[in-house]
Amino acid sequence: MGWIGKLLNGGDEKNKPAPVTAAAAPEATLQPATITEIDAMYYRWLAAAGSAQAPAETEQQILDELARLVREPIAGAALVPRIPAIIPQLMRTLQDENMSAAKLSAQLAQDVLLVAEVYREANRPCYQSRYNASPSINNMEGAIMLLGQNGMRMLLARVAFRPIVSMQSGGLTVRTAPLIWRQSEKCALAASLVAPTMHANAFDSYLAGLMANVGLVVAFRLIDQMHGPDVFPQSDAFIAQVFAQARILSVRIAELWEFPQSVTRAIGQVGVDANADADPQAQALALGERLSKLRMLADSGRFPADDPFVTTGLGKSELLAFGKLADDDE
């Protein structure tokens, strides 16, 4: 090739600039799992559902019955045990900032199971000093002083809801009710931990976390009674509707049980995904539900605790709360 050709072609091959290559595409940013996706995994894990899918007609019949209970919440409330009568009296005492440990001790003495629960809680390792091998708490006033006002409130709230898991029913309810209760306790704890950063009331958030799943317990009782022996209702659309209707039923039952309006409002406002404009109480509950369900799935071996499905979208404080939800040795 002559010099003119070389000039037109940019000179020798060795002097040619390297061909321009397309810039490498940035790695796709992981998006946090939606609560709908988490609910679907949680539901199928709860039920230990196989692959056999129930007919659409069966799913619709269950949803229709659940909708009826939403319209008639007294019937729905009849499917779960009532809160023990002594609990509201104790809660009223605990609302008093100047409560007397002696007065509360006298009220607690009316229920031997409550007395045992208070002693058990006060003697848990987490209440004992690392450097002080103190003797066990063996008097009620001492236990009350150790737990404090907020600790007593949370203890009584847990005790009030615990009968829900002792219901005798079909095999599915026997399996799911204790798991739902464990998740509810974790939800209540998580919601109370994140509440201050959202300017929400920690104790109301705790109550909302305990109450939010009562409707789901009722839903599983219906499913237990109505699904066929070899198939299970588990379509994505069905699961989404079960959680939506169960939430409304939880609100209706909470209203019947005269829960604070802030609690019923929070449960009702928690949507498919947390809304930044939602009531702070609802935001705390939504995050509590997310963290507690992910914790249950992680602890069951469904995911490692540090799996991106679990951790994506969680900030430092939320990861700290997630860590505190791990089961402890009592």
List PLM regions with ranges.
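Conserved alpha-helical "signature site"
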Residues: G2-L210, V217-Q225, F232-E330
